[in-house]
């Protein structure tokens, strides 16, 4: 491709509404332009990257044995009503009616559509297992689209759905897809981690997310320093460490006027937050009569509650909700000053996090306004109903697999795989005949990759102060050739044309910068766009039989003979 025939839409200034680096650089490099909130047009430069990601994903999905289909983004609302998600999904689901007053939705995902296809096309266990995939547009009506294509309303996704006769068959395909995703992200040149994850609104029994490590990531992931263990912080188990020591202090109450937070209390008492507990009073599961009990959750003062873990406790209502003022008053409790003493005796379930359960001589609320208790000890001063993992892990915690300690880094979720079980097949009546001639409900898995998000995530992981640094596999062009003074030097242009043709014949994506621009402008544009290899051809180099070569990550350029250059470029 020649720059004289290509849309160069680079910007010198960063648009004010671009928050994260990928959004800034995609705009400046001429990859995308905003059409409306959360909607973007992909320009030729961006489309080239998008198509390369698309090709790698498609190649690996085909290699896995999955079959490509293409489903409508517009879906009948009746399918979503059948699955029970029409109301459950919330305002992110864009609903509308056609001219005949038939209700439809714009698909944020395709579980309903693919299950409808399967129930009509799959008749026998002999047709199983099957795995269908598509690369298709999705629409989610985000309340606040932000970060460019990282969280847009319209986006491209690769979604796959598998159907099975048994859980064992699902597990086999799940493992294949896990390996397939690992190959995809490796080929894309990304530093990523597969992590155990919560199934969220999709549902199901098992789930892994694939995260690209980047400082701008919205998710915290924990992984071992000495093993392959990795999990979303929401899912990472906080291992019990140590044993409770015998009491050495007497229990007593102290005045703590207007000191409501743990930080304030510990500073006021000159105490270590690690030697304190904090209470979170939440609503429990209602009984047969509709009465909602209060459940007291206690954590160490320096730890944070993991709401997903708390919601998994059978006595805690989901979604998590704090106890009302009326409920607190009924037990004589004051928010900000609640301690564990006497709660079990009042009929309140006391669930204590593992780390808090091994404390002795700790600080806690006194169950009186403007007072706290010091020298508190479990069993002697306060009873525990149950010890349960309630907290987020922190850096340095032991890895749950017993190997090393945990590191925590930010990640951008670019892929997610689920074992759905029969959630959708049961709801939509997707059954096939078994070996015994009787119908049974099929078991499902689903597997997604955010194709447009991958592009942004790659930039978040690969950039410097000059612009993007693309992994070669997805760079819009692999090589840029810059002939110096081409409009005045036929010899330079001729050499550039010859090298351009030779490299193209070898299968490289090559950009010949034949613009009548100053060299500095050309170099700046090429660095901004992140092209991995730059070759400059000038009169002096031709006299010496060399080409000036600079890799995008190189600090300095070097002069290479043609043989050295071709060896450097060899894949």
Curated annotation (Swiss-Prot):
Keywords: Aminoacyl-tRNA synthetase, ATP-binding, Cytoplasm, Ligase, Nucleotide-binding, Protein biosynthesis. PROSITE patterns: AA_TRNA_LIGASE_II. It catalyses: tRNA(Pro) + L-proline + ATP = L-prolyl-tRNA(Pro) + AMP + diphosphate. Signal peptide: none annotated. Pfam families: HGTP_anticodon (PF03129), tRNA-synt_2b (PF00587), tRNA_edit (PF04073). Its EC number is 6.1.1.15. InterPro entries: aa-tRNA-synt_IIb, aa-tRNA-synth_II, aa-tRNA-synth_II/BPL/LPL, Anticodon-bd, Anticodon-bd_dom_sf, Pro-tRNA-ligase_IIa, Pro-tRNA-synth_IIa_bac-type, Pro-tRNA-Synthase_IIa_type1. GO terms for cellular component: cytosol. Homodimer. Catalyzes the attachment of proline to tRNA(Pro) in a two-step reaction: proline is first activated by ATP to form Pro-AMP and then transferred to the acceptor end of tRNA(Pro). As ProRS can inadvertently accommodate and process non-cognate amino acids such as alanine and cysteine, to avoid such errors it has two additional distinct editing activities against alanine. One activity is designated as 'pretransfer' editing and involves the tRNA(Pro)-independent hydrolysis of activated Ala-AMP. This is Proline--tRNA ligase.
């Amino acid at each position: 491709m020649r720059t004289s025939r290509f849309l160069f839409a680079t910007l010198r200034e960063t648009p004010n509404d671009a928050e994260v680096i990928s959004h800034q650089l995609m705009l400046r490099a001429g990859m995308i332009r905003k059409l409306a909130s959360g909607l973007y047009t992909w320009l030729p430069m961006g489309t080239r990257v998008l198509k390369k990601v698309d090709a790698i994903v498609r190649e690996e999905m085909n290699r896995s044995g999955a079959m490509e289909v293409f489903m409508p983004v517009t879906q009948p609302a009746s399918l979503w009503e059948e699955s029970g998600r029409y109301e459950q999904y919330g305002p992110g689901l864009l609903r509308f009616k056609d001219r005949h007053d038939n209700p439809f939705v714009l698909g944020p995902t395709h579980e309903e559509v693919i299950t409808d296809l399967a129930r009509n096309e799959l008749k026998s266990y002999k047709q199983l297992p099957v795995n269908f995939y598509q690369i298709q547009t999705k629409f989610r009506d985000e309340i606040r689209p932000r970060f460019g294509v990282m969280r847009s309303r319209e986006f491209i996704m690769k979604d796959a759905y598998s159907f099975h006769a048994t859980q064992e068959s699902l597990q086999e395909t799940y493992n294949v897809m896990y390996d397939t995703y690992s190959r995809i992200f490796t080929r894309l040149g990304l530093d990523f981690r597969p992590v155990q994850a919560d199934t969220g609104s999709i549902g199901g029994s098992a789930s892994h997310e694939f995260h690209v490590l980047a400082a701008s990531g919205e998710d915290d992931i924990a992984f071992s320093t000495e093993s392959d263990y990795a999990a979303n912080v929401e899912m990472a188990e906080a291992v019990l460490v140590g044993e409770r020591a015998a009491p050495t202090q007497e229990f007593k109450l102290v005045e703590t006027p207007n000191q409501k937070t743990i930080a304030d209390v510990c500073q006021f008492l000159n105490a270590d937050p690690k030697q304190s507990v904090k209470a979170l009073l939440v609503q429990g599961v209602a009984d047969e009569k509709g009465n909602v009990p209060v459940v007291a959750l206690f954590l160490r003062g320096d730890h944070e509650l993991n709401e997903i873990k708390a919601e998994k406790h059978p006595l805690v209502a989901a979604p998590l909700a704090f106890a009302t003022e009326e409920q607190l008053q009924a037990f004589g409790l004051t928010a900000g000053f609640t301690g564990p003493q006497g709660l079990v005796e009042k009929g309140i379930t006391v669930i204590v996090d593992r780390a808090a359960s091994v404390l002795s001589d700790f600080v806690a609320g006194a169950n009186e306004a403007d007072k706290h208790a010091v020298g508190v000890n479990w069993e002697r001063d306060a009873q525990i109903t149950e010890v349960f993992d309630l907290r987020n892990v922190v850096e340095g915690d032991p890895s749950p697999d017993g190997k090393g300690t945990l590191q925590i880094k930010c990640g951008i979720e670019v892929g997610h795989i689920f074992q759905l079980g029969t959630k959708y097949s049961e709801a939509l009546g997707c059954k096939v005949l078994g070996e015994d001639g009787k119908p049974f409900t099929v078991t499902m898995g689903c597997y997604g990759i955010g194709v447009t998000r991958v592009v942004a995530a790659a930039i978040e992981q690969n950039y410097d102060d000059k612009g993007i640094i693309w992994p070669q596999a997805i760079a819009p062009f692999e090589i840029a050739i810059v002939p110096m003074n081409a409009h005045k030097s036929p010899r330079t242009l001729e050499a550039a044309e010859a090298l351009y043709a030779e490299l193209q014949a070898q299968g490289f994506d090559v950009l010949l910068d034949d613009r009548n621009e100053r060299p500095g402008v050309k170099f700046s544009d090429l660095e901004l766009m992140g092209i991995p290899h730059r070759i400059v051809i000038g009169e002096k180099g031709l006299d010496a039989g060399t080409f000036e070569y600079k890799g995008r990550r190189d600090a300095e350029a070097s002069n290479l003979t043609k043989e050295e250059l071709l060896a450097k470029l060899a894949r």
